[in-house]
């Protein structure tokens, strides 16, 4: 009773309210201290800007394609490929997803990939005269539509990071069409087959994320990069040895998983 008289109910309530205010201020201070600093936010956003530059590179590649400067077009697409290869590790290093939660790097990456991997190469395939004239526009439309559906497919990657089906790598397909320069009928049949294979559930090797035999894959990718640069510098006028090596690497990327599974079935 003495304590109750000393500390009246009104005063006790005031003490409680004051305590709650102090706790809330302390929590706000702690949350503020956990917020990313402006420099961190700027660095994280710069990664998104870097990724978006891939779309600008696609425009430059398209301008070269319209002029029928095919080797220059592929060189720009190669720059876009480098951006696509390194922006992800940088984003994970800087924790961009949490530092800049209002910007979706995944969506941005899909947008850039579609114009660099699909749209510009599709134009090159259709406009280059490599296909039968009657089939070229139809196959161009098929490339765009099936690739858009593939990009929206949540099953596009298997659990072991292999791609399911032909992974809409039309920049690579276009490169090989220019390299091989087959008769229009053969090239038309190849493009039609790749369109169909987009939805066939075979596994295509992801050059970076598949762990199995990564050392071999990365070595082959390095060789492929050197030979591809040489091919573009020569405007696709290379000898059969270079062509054979480039085709062998492409076949390994496309069918190594099926080959390994087949070999293991006899073990």
Swiss-Prot record:
Residue runs in coiled coils: none
Region forming the signal peptide = none
Where exactly are the transmembrane stretches of this chain? 43-63, 70-90, 103-123, 125-145, 163-183, 185-205, 216-236, 240-260
Q: Which organism is it from?
A: Bradyrhizobium diazoefficiens (strain JCM 10833 / BCRC 13528 / IAM 13628 / NBRC 14792 / USDA 110)
Ranges of the Cytoplasmic topological domain: 1-42, 91-102, 146-162, 206-215, 261-267
Q: Which Gene Ontology cellular component annotation is one that this UniProt entry carries?
A: plasma membrane
Q: What is its EC number?
A: 2.7.8.24
| Cofactor list | Mn(2+)
Q: How does it sit in the membrane?
A: Multi-pass membrane protein
Q: Where in the cell is it found?
A: Cell inner membrane
GO MF terms held by the record:
phosphatidylcholine synthase activity
- InterPro entries reported in the protein's UniProt record: CDP-OH_P_trans (IPR000462), CDP-OH_PTrfase_TM_dom (IPR043130), PcS (IPR026027)
Q: What is this protein called?
A: Phosphatidylcholine synthase
- Parts of the chain on the Periplasmic side: 64-69, 124, 184, 237-239
Q: Which EC class is the enzyme in?
A: transferase
Which family does the similarity line name? Belongs to the CDP-alcohol phosphatidyltransferase class-I family.
Record keywords, A-Z: Cell inner membrane, Cell membrane, Lipid biosynthesis, Lipid metabolism, Manganese, Membrane, Phospholipid biosynthesis, Phospholipid metabolism, Transferase, Transmembrane, Transmembrane helix
Catalytic activity, reaction form = a CDP-1,2-diacyl-sn-glycerol + choline = a 1,2-diacyl-sn-glycero-3-phosphocholine + CMP + H(+)
One Pfam family per UniProt: CDP-OH_P_transf
GO biological process: any one?
Answer: phospholipid biosynthetic process
Function statement:
Condenses choline with CDP-diglyceride to produce phosphatidylcholine and CMP.
